């Protein structure tokens, strides 16, 4: 399949020059009745407040960063882009209401977001009914993207990442046998846990698990219970503030145990929240390597605007805008419609900041994973992609 040069790549460096977008200042394409090129409006769903606000702000900046770059180069086939971002507060019900608002607005050509798999799954019926793409930077539930041809995600799936955690981090890298798991009581965390347990059983791991409700602050009873089984590792499956709270409360109780988490990625906010950040290990499908000039420049540019270092999440948000732009480029001089964007998006092959972005028939991305940890209050790669090269 034909690949297209990326305007994002051109803005960054020649290292990403094969990928997302070409012909950005072309004069062909759909026009308004007045003969002028229409502005393509996108709807953004992001948790700008609440437990996931760090990620929501990252979405907001990543979306706008890409749009500003595209528009500065004349748009795509002359079409400029704009985005309206709604605060979903990390709540699936709020997200569904806002997705409906976007879907009912005929000027909105595609929806970018939401952050959680639960919210994206709740919106799947809505986007399917209205025939509008919902492209999530981060939804990782294995059953999300195949809910509708209009559902897409680029984060990767928990039926790959969670088994990687069991086999490569716990069994192979740490040599652990007895595992304590504390997880959020949510659809996303249940998917993580179920896929983790399937591989953990194959690896012969002895797992004890407990869950907690959203908004829980006091984890002392769970920590006491888990400590009593004398595990080798404490694993937390969550993406919000509870990750730091659980590990910090374990530290405060005097529990000296290896910390592992599935969900937060390489979050700078998490490092700042933890009392013993150097004791944490996570999985990640992407890392901002300081030795990679292209990625380093992107990260520095993001940090200047955001005030914090980026994780994969805002980079995926940035890539999502370019994926839509690439779809518009592929439509060429045809009419820009929701269905045309869906079809072009499904058929495209791309290279973004976060790597290869080639959709499976289900509408998600196959990712590889690495092991990351903290040294001297900075994230580092402990084992690269090759660590799981033999597969699960």
Regions found by a protein language model. Give the residues of each.
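Short, polar/charged alpha-helical segment
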Residues: 54-77, 194-201
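Short, low-complexity disordered leader/linker segments with a strong preference
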Residues: 1-41, 72, 387-392
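Beta-alpha junction/loop-to-helix N-cap segments that form part of ligand/metal-binding clefts
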Residues: 28-31, 54-59, 73-144, 154, ...
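Extracellular/periplasmic periplasmic-binding protein-like sensory domains
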Residues: 247-318, 373, 385-390
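Extracellular/periplasmic Venus flytrap/periplasmic-binding protein
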Residues: 97, 141-143, 149-254, 288-289, ...
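Periplasmic-binding protein-like
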Residues: 102, 106-115, 135-137, 178-183, ...
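Segments of small-molecule ligand-sensing domains
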Residues: 304-314, 325-379
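Extracytoplasmic "Venus flytrap"
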Residues: 35-36, 40-64, 86-93, 115-116, ...
């Amino acid at each position: 399949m034909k690949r297209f040069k990326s305007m994002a790549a051109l803005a960054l460096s020649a290292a990403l020059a094969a990928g997302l977008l070409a012909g950005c200042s072309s004069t062909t394409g759909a026009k308004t009745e007045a003969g002028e090129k229409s502005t393509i409006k996108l709807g953004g769903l992001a948790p700008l407040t609440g437990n996931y606000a760090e990620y929501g702000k990252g979405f907001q900046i990543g979306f706008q960063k890409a749009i500003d770059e595209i528009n500065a180069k004349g748009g795509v086939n002359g079409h400029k882009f704009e985005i309206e971002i709604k605060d979903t507060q990390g709540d699936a019900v709020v997200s569904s209401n806002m997705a409906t608002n976007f879907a009912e607005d005929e000027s909105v050509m595609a929806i970018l977001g939401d952050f959680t798999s639960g919210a994206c799954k709740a919106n799947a019926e809505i986007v399917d009914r209205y025939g509008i793409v919902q492209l999530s930077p981060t939804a990782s539930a294995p059953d999300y993207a195949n809910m509708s041809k209009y559902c897409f995600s680029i984060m990767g799936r928990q039926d790959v990442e969670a088994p990687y955690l069991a086999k490569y981090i716990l069994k192979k890298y740490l040599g652990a046998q007895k595992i304590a798991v504390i997880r959020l009581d949510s659809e996303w965390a249940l998917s993580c846990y179920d896929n983790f347990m399937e591989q953990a059983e194959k690896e012969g791991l002895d797992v004890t698990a407990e869950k907690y409700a959203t908004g829980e602050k006091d984890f002392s009873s769970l920590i006491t219970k888990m400590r009593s089984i004398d595990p080798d590792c404490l694993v937390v499956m969550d993406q919000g503030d509870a990750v730091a709270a659980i590990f910090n409360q374990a530290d405060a109780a005097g529990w000296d145990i290896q910390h592992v988490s599935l969900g937060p990625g390489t979050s700078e906010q998490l490092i700042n929240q933890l009392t013993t950040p150097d004791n944490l290990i996570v999985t990640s499908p992407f890392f901002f390597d300081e030795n990679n000039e292209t990625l380093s420049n992107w990260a520095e540019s993001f940090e200047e605007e955001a005030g914090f270092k980026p994780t994969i999440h805002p980079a995926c948000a940035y890539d999502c805008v370019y994926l839509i732009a690439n779809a518009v480029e592929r439509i060429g001089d045809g009419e820009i419609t929701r269905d045309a964007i869906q079809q072009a998006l499904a058929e495209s092959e791309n290279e973004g900041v976060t790597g290869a972005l080639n959709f499976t028939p289900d509408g998600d991305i196959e990712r590889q994973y690495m092991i990351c940890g903290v040294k001297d209050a900075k994230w580092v790669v402990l084992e690269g992609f090759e660590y799981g090269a033999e597969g699960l």
